A protein has these predicted regions:
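Positively charged n-region of N-terminal signal peptides that target proteins for export
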Residues: 1-4
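Bacterial N-terminal signal peptides
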Residues: 7-14
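Phosphate-group recognition and catalysis centered on beta-loop-alpha active-site segments
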Residues: 17-262
Length: 262
C-alpha cells in the first residue's frame, strides 16, 4: 500500500523543486533609464524618475565625456545629437554648457554625472548600473559615495580587477572587452597557472549564447550572467532564461516584492 502511494507523495515535492527552479528571481535593469513615452536610450532625468516610480531597483546610465572632459549621460554623441535635433553634428561632442541647454526629443532633461550622482544619493534603494566608462579613477571622482550601490560594466580585465578591489557592489566583465576571450580562458586556469581576480559576472549580449567559445566555457564553469537587451521573455529559450540572473530591458517591468539583492 505504501509503495503504491509513494509516487503520489514524492510528486508534489518534485513539482515544487521544478517550480522553484523556474521562478528563480532575475533582477531587471532599466536600460539607459528604460522606455519613456515610447523613446529609448534617453538617459534623461525623466527616464530615471519613471524607472524608479515603476519599481526598478537597478537603473543603467551610459556615461561619456563632453568636449571639455566632463562626464555626462548619453549613449553616444551621435545618438545624443540626433535626439536633440543636432544630427548635422554627427558624432561631435558638445561642450558642457551646450549639453545642459539641450532638450532630448524636445522635452527631456539631459543629465551630467553630477546630476546622476545626486539622483541616486537621494534614494538609498536604487542601484546605479554604468555603461561605456569603466575607468576606476573617473568613477571614483564622480561617484565617491556610491560604490556600495554601483554595478559597473568593466571593459578591460585590468579595470575589472581594480574595481573589485575597490569594493564596488558588483562588477560585470563585458563581452565587448577586447581581452574578453583571453581573460575568461585565464580564469579557468587560475588555480594552476595564473594569479588574479576570478571573474564571477559577465555582461553578455543575447547573441552570445550562440558563440561556440561561450558554450565551451559555460560547460567548464558557470558564470553569473547579466544579459542585454531583452524586451520579451519569449525571445529566450527556457534553458537560456535559467542561466540569467540580471536582464537589461527597455520595457519589461519588475514584479513587486521580487527585487531582493542576492
Amino acid at each position: 500500500m505504501i509503495r503504491r502511494l509513494l509516487p503520489f507523495l514524492i510528486l508534489p515535492l518534485f513539482l515544487s523543486c521544478i517550480t522553484q527552479e523556474r521562478s528563480v528571481r532575475r533582477e531587471l535593469i532599466a536600460h539607459a533609464g528604460g522606455v519613456l513615452d515610447g523613446y529609448v536610450y534617453t538617459n534623461s532625468l525623466e527616464a530615471l524618475q519613471s524607472a524608479a516610480e515603476n519599481g526598478y531597483r537597478f537603473i543603467e546610465v551610459d556615461l561619456i565625456m563632453s568636449a571639455d572632459s566632463v562626464l555626462v549621460a548619453a549613449h553616444s554623441w551621435e545618438d545624443f545629437n540626433r535626439m536633440t535635433g543636432n544630427a548635422h553634428r554627427g558624432d561631435s561632442a558638445m561642450m558642457l554648457v551646450q549639453f545642459v541647454e539641450q532638450r532630448i526629443h524636445g522635452r527631456y532633461t539631459p543629465m551630467t554625472a553630477a546630476m546622476v550622482n545626486d539622483f541616486f544619493m537621494s534614494d538609498s534603494s536604487l542601484y546605479l548600473v554604468t555603461d561605456k566608462t569603466s575607468e576606476p579613477v573617473i568613477l571614483a571622482e564622480y561617484f565617491p559615495n556610491l560604490k556600495q550601490r554601483m554595478v559597473v560594466e568593466a571593459f578591460t580585465y585590468e579595470h575589472y580587477q581594480q574595481l573589485v578591489d575597490e569594493g564596488y557592489f558588483r562588477v560585470l566583465y563585458s563581452c565587448m572587452a577586447e581581452d574578453f576571450a583571453s581573460a575568461i580562458t585565464r580564469n579557468l586556469m587560475f588555480d594552476k597557472l595564473f594569479p588574479g581576480k576570478r571573474i564571477e559576472w559577465i555582461a553578455l549580449h543575447t547573441s552570445g549564447f550562440s558563440y561556440p567559445m561561450f558554450k565551451l566555457l559555460d560547460r567548464m564553469r558557470r558564470f553569473n550572467i547579466a544579459l542585454f537587451t531583452v524586451d520579451n521573455y519569449n525571445e529566450l529559450h527556457p534553458w537560456q532564461l535559467e542561466r540569467v540572473k540580471m536582464i537589461y530591458t527597455n520595457t519589461l517591468l519588475p514584479v513587486p516584492d521580487t527585487a531582493e539583492i542576492p
